[in-house]
């Protein structure tokens, strides 16, 4: 019989002042069932897989039983949602059980999402349908496999209870793992209340836990702002490189550690267009694909505003220091973005004209409605000695439209003289063959919601956790959607 799961909890956030959170227990559910346990992640966290698969483990994932050492809390935060200020949000359907120190010595949050009402529920039921649980599990693990900093999914369970949204749906709970759940909105919460002591405590906490190298800096809070700016710029550049659209880049979904946080109405590009926006609630396309760098800077500006009292006692000097830090965002983003563009094109060296060459390709893709992921993957398979019939041409409605650009690209590749096998391998390592296409996510959600069938979820996880591998047996899952499979809108659904 499996032993009781042992969680090595050490809950630093729960030791902060009480105004940072509300103490609340998860609400038990009627008949939990284990959908998926992320065994590699469990092992990395130092947890015993066999014990987690037992009845006691299931009860913990369902919120029916607290593991020893847990101190469940719902975090307080505020935020700008679609540019509009909301002074109190907080964890309305999630409970942070505590923190564990993993096998690499890193502190990780363990959160139950969909675990019942909290003081921040604002009239909601605190629950989650199984569909969004499946979506987030798939998305977070796919993003991790792509090499993008992200929260992770440790487990998904059904609750045996219905959840009423636009229709009645089966309930679910996700166990989310994160390096941090501190957001820009956490700082905004105390800034709006003019609680400078709390802001200082929070900033010092973030430095001590996530940026310890800044502790001895002469201006640690300014250094913190700059570090968050750098990590956020790097994160968004990484999103752009794989065609990811977050969909709801509110300040309460902007992590202080450069981690992708919250998978609501997200999506991945199919046909390339820079203004693509799938989110049904984003009626002004505020968070469209090409707007994500601008919005990241806007969110970081809100963070900088909250830190002004900590940057200097003179407001003008504080504003000047914050402004200088914010001016570093665009250069950092462009450096990361351009480096990733070069890598996607197989260019190992930086030369004048490289970015123009990349933009020419993107413009051509937009005009031809070519698939973002397929084009770059096909370029990885191109051979310079193939005069005209390379695989990338087949990605375009008018194959000959690519020929002029392809000739210039091959000429640029020849300037480096890199062996072709090395160039192809390098490109395949950054241009995924498999992404969580919107219609595939919907396939898994529909199967889980309508039939209680988690086979599609399992199949996608097998493939998406190896996104750069050829996997010829999964060729159908690499294909763009057929017209009848197109997903034009995504929803939060929670």
UniProtKB/Swiss-Prot annotation:
Superkingdom classification of source: Bacteria
Q: What is its EC number?
A: 2.7.7.-, 2.7.7.108
Q: What residues sit in the active site?
A: 252
Report keywords, A-Z: ATP-binding, Magnesium, Manganese, Metal-binding, Nucleotide-binding, Nucleotidyltransferase, Transferase
Listed binding positions for Mg(2+) are: 253, 262
The terms under GO molecular function for this entry are: AMPylase activity; ATP binding; magnesium ion binding
Q: What does this protein do?
A: Nucleotidyltransferase involved in the post-translational modification of proteins. It can catalyze the addition of adenosine monophosphate (AMP) or uridine monophosphate (UMP) to a protein, resulting in modifications known as AMPylation and UMPylation.
The protein, known as? Protein nucleotidyltransferase YdiU
Species for this entry: Alkalilimnicola ehrlichii (strain ATCC BAA-1101 / DSM 17681 / MLHE-1)
Organism placement in taxonomy: Bacteria, Pseudomonadati, Pseudomonadota, Gammaproteobacteria, Chromatiales
């Amino acid at each position: 019989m499996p032993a009781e799961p042992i969680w090595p909890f050490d809950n630093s956030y729960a030791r902060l002042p009480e105004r940072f959170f509300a103490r609340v227990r998860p609400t038990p559910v009627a008949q939990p069932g284990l959908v998926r346990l992320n065994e590699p992640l469990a092992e990395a966290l130092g947890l015993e897989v066999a014990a987690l698969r037992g009845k006691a483990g299931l009860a913990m994932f369902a919120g029916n039983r607290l593991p020893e050492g847990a101190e469940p809390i719902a975090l307080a935060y505020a935020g700008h949602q679609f540019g509009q200020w909301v002074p109190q949000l907080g964890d309305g359907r999630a409970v942070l059980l505590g923190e564990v120190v993993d096998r690499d010595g890193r502190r990780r949050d363990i959160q139950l999402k969909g675990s019942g009402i909290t003081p921040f529920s604002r009239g909601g039921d605190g629950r989650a349908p199984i569909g969004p649980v499946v979506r987030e599990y798939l998305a977070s693990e796919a993003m991790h496999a792509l090499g993008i900093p992200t929260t992770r999914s440790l487990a998904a369970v059904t609750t045996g209870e219905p959840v009423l949204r636009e229709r009645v749906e089966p309930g679910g709970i996700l166990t989310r793992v994160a390096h941090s759940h501190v957001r820009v909105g956490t700082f905004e919460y105390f800034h709006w209340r003019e609680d400078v002591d709390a802001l200082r405590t929070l900033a010092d906490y973030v430095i001590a836990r996530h940026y310890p190298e800044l502790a001895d800096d002469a201006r640690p809070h300014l250094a913190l702002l700059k570090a968050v700016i750098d990590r956020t710029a790097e994160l968004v550049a990484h999103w752009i490189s794989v065609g990811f659209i977050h969909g709801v880049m509110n300040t309460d979904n902007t992590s202080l550690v450069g981690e992708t946080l919250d998978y609501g109405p997200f999506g991945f590009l199919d046909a390339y267009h820079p203004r693509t926006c799938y989110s049904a609630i984003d009626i002004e396309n505020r968070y469209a694909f090409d707007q994500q760098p601008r919005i990241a800077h806007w969110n970081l500006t809100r963070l900088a505003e909250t830190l002004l009292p900590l940057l200097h006692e003179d407001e003008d000097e504080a504003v000047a220091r914050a402004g200088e830090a914010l001016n570093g965002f665009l250069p950092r983003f462009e450096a990361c973005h351009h480096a990733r563009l070069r890598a996607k094109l197989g260019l190992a060296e930086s030369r004048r004209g490289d970015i123009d060459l990349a933009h020419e390709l993107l413009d051509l893709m937009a005009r031809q409605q070519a698939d973002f992921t397929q084009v770059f993957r096909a370029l990885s398979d191109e051979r310079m000695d193939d005069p005209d019939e390379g695989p990338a041409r087949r990605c375009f409605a008018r194959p000959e439209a690519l020929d002029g650009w392809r000739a210039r690209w091959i000429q640029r590749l020849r300037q480096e003289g890199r062996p072709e096998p090395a160039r192809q391998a390098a490109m395949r390592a950054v241009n995924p063959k498999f992404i969580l296409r919107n219609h595939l996510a919907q396939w898994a959600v529909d199967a889980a919601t309508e039939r209680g069938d988690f086979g599609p979820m399992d199949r996608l996880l097998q493939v998406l956790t190896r996104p750069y591998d050829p996997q010829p047996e999964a060729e159908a899952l690499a294909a763009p959607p057929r017209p009848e499979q197109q997903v034009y809108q995504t929803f939060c659904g929670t």
